[in-house]
């Protein structure tokens, strides 16, 4: 699509790709600090992306040297069967109508599937004026590509930025971009004094220590197992059903994962991606996932049987297990 074209901004140029196979050889070297921009993860998106998503990969060059990489995603909300079924009030119905009819073709500069600043990474310091130019120009070029196909992009979103980055970008071409906050990126810092789960629990107030004990007691009979690739394949249908229940009942959703997403991610990322199954009487009733991102352990998607969740405080126990 863009194989013969490179867009230049002063000394910095960028090139847009629509296939992981086309990416420069040094892509992963540049993206080494963020797994969500590495080819192992991008290949997962390419092989098991949501049915309504198309991905684009942006290489940023200084002369001929690759110094930055970025991700863009196009979503066709017309292909989405539900925006989320938890809230059924009148305002939600109006919101869904507006999205379906006036914002159905949406372009994200960044990763719409996760929270956190995972939209771009550089090997050297680049001023925010240049970053804003690259992101805006990339969005314009991808928008033009779809326009030539007869598809009008209704909404362009740039996500996510830490506050100090947002402040700097607003000084330049982002000055006219509407800024909004949505679901937060929750960060849990581990105290270096904590060497065991007991140390963590001991640091809690009495209220939350009691909650921990109550949740653990409710979890009796649940067996947690780190699933191998073969086991993920074996339980793939159940894993997806558990995920789909949680996703469908979220207050708002713009995509649903493909059924083979978790097995593809396990195959591509190996031990960096962990999927923990929760079994009751040998039946899989829940799962949570973790992905090692440099020195950060990222929580990914999860799923559970709602009846077991209520009775056994499954979700809360998953959160506790993630701290181990």
Language-model segments: which ranges?
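A conserved beta-strand-loop-helix scaffold within acyl/acetyltransferase catalytic domains
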Residues: 2, 6-89, 154-310
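Acyl-donor binding region in acyl/amide transferases
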Residues: 54-55, 77-176, 296-324
């Amino acid at each position: 699509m863009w194989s013969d074209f490179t867009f230049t901004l002063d000394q910095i140029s960028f090139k847009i790709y629509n296939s992981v196979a086309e990416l420069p050889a040094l892509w992963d070297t540049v993206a080494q600090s963020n797994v969500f921009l590495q080819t192992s993860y991008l290949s997962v998106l390419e092989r098991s992306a949501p049915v309504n998503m198309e991905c684009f990969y942006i290489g940023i060059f200084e002369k001929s040297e690759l110094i930055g990489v970025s991700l863009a995603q196009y979503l066709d909300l017309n292909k989405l069967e539900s925006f989320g079924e938890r809230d059924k009030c009148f305002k939600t119905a109006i919101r869904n109508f507006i999205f379906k009819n006036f914002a159905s073709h949406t372009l994200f500069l960044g990763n719409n599937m996760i929270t956190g600043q995972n939209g771009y990474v550089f090997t050297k310091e680049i001023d925010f004026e240049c970053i804003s130019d690259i992101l805006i120009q990339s969005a314009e070029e991808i928008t033009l590509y779809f326009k030539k196909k007869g598809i009008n992009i209704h909404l362009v979103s740039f996500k996510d930025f830490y506050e100090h980055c947002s402040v700097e970008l607003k000084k330049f071409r982002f000055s006219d971009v509407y800024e909004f906050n949505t679901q937060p990126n929750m960060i849990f810092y581990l105290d270096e004094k904590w060497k065991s789960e007991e140390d963590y629990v001991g640091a809690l107030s009495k209220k939350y220590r009691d909650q921990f004990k109550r949740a653990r007691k409710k979890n009796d009979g649940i067996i947690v197992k780190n699933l191998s690739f073969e086991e993920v394949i074996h339980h793939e249908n159940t894993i997806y059903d558990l995920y789909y229940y949680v996703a469908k009942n979220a207050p708002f959703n713009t995509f649903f994962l493909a059924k083979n997403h978790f097995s593809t991610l396990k195959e591509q990322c190996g031990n960096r991606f962990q999927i923990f199954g929760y079994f009751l009487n040998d039946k899989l009733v829940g799962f949570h996932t973790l992905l090692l991102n440099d020195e950060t352990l990222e929580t990914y998607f999860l799923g559970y049987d709602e009846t077991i969740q209520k009775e056994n405080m499954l979700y809360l126990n998953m959160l506790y297990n993630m701290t181990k």
